[in-house]
């Protein structure tokens, strides 16, 4: 992962793994300069030292391998989607209902909580299932992109 987007792994209703933010407040917290209760309101809470699209190459951090079990929930979200909630609230919402129901509800709550200062909201979640291999037809997959923005293709140089 990179920056302050987070990956959560949830097993049996409990947080199994959470990635470490690449932010100034995370470093300050690890160094004992601030308390955990200060993180959400600290003036530097949105300053990241590694990100995609910045002037410098990102510091990509690979988490330790964690074997998944049937029923585990994996969620990847931007800071706009996780910041309005405590980790316990986010974990509870994703652990007690299907991701298909939890994700839209969490995004709506995050948007309302942020108000006119709403950051980008991205939250993707899935529940792991054992032994089910699914083949998806490319045409079928592409037909389900009505709310997805396709990447802009670079122009080809005609020289």
How does the language model describe each region?
Residues 50-77, 81-159:
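C-terminal catalytic subdomain
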Residues 2, 8-69, 118-125:
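"…together with the soluble PPM/PP2C metallo-phosphatase catalytic core" -> "…together
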